[in-house]
Regions:
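N-terminal secretory signal peptides that target proteins for export/translocation
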Residues: 1-18
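Expand to "…catalyze enediolate/carbanion chemistry for C-C bond making/breaking, isomerization
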Residues: 38-321
Length: 321
């Protein structure tokens, strides 16, 4: 025989539970039902870890190399850095080796642990041709799957504009960022394989940041001459330029006719930094010691090229983890 008291208690419990479910549904649905109240949307994931950090206002640290061995590729993939660039200007121009190096940096264990397709370390490259002669190497580099290109010897706005165009696909009609009009040819099968996305997805990601806030390619222009310093504002203001880059400054000192370490060189460095800040693009420099690294970061440089020991020690001086 059914116990009426027990039946009443069960019914009360059931009714109470249903009220909680309905209330929870109302609370969860409230943002959708409230007129004029936008629903927060998750930001799209940048597949370029350097851009992901720069977009958040962080400093990024990296290396350069001429060693394109698979052994070093595996080492770099787990190094405590954000990028590495292959220096193919002062080392043999070897695209098959560059391709294998990028494949060697593909760390499936890290991808699985991270839970998304963003690598820990981005790969850029620097090539022999000057900026206005670089279309063919840029096409090769991006179709291999690189995350960005460092252009040598950018002296004028025209050279900067051409560099940008070589990295962009032609845009769809009606695009708000149609210009600068891209001239990159379509054929990124190797890149899509390494990025782990479809061709359509790759075309959405393969645009220049910060011109396209969702872009994952970075155009970095090296200032290496007095002429480049004279045209800094015109170069830095070119839409699509992501960063200005200074190496150790040897070519710049040669152009100035002075020795490394001369005061004129540092004045030139500071002009580059000021132009980057004025036009809200990233600014890259080389640091040879931990103290130099800390000094440059405090000045506002947000892309630092050095070595792992210097980066580790410099970040410790800055109180960074």
């Amino acid at each position: 025989m059914l116990n009426p008291l027990r039946h009443s208690s069960l019914r009360s419990f059931h009714d109470g539970l249903m009220r909680l479910v309905v209330l929870a549904g109302i609370v969860l649905a409230a943002p959708l039902l409230t007129p004029g109240r936008p629903v927060a949307q998750q930001k799209p994931l940048h597949l370029n870890p350097v851009i992901a950090k720069l977009a958040e206002g962080k400093t990024v640290y990296g290396l350069n190399t001429g060693d394109l061995s698979l052994v070093y590729a595996r080492e770099v993939a787990r190094a405590p850095v954000d990028f590495i660039y292959a220096d193919l200007e002062h080392n043999p121009l070897d695209f098959p080796a560059l391709h294998m190096f990028l494949m060697g940096m593909t760390d499936k264990a890290t991808i699985l642990k991270k839970g998304n397709l963003q690598p820990n370390v981005a790969l850029f490259a620097r090539f022999p041709p000057e900026a206005d002669q670089s279309q063919w190497v840029v096409k090769q580099a991006l179709d291999i799957g690189l995350h960005g290109v460092i252009f040598n010897g950018v002296d004028t706005k025209e050279q900067a504009l051409f560099a940008v165009k070589t990295m962009r696909y032609p845009q769809l009609k009606g695009s708000k960022i149609y210009q600068p009009a891209g001239i990159r040819g379509a054929g990124p099968a190797n890149a899509t394989w390494l990025w782990g996305i479809s061709g359509d997805e790759y075309e959405r990601h393969a645009d220049l940041w910060p011109l396209n806030p969702e872009g994952d390619l970075l155009a970095m222009l090296m200032i290496e001459s007095v002429e480049g310093l004279e045209n800094l504002d015109a170069i830095a203001s070119t839409p699509g330029v992501g960063a200005l880059f200074l190496g150790v400054g040897n070519d710049l000192t040669h152009s100035m006719g002075v020795r490394p370490g001369s005061p004129e060189v540092e004045v030139g460095f500071q002009k580059v930094l000021s132009a980057c800040k004025a036009h809200k693009i990233a600014c890259a420099i080389t640091a040879n010691t931990a103290n130099d690294l800390a000094k440059r970061v405090k000045e506002g440089w947000n892309i630092i090229r050095s070595t792992v020991p210097v980066i580790t020690a410099g970040r410790a001086l800055l109180g960074e983890r």
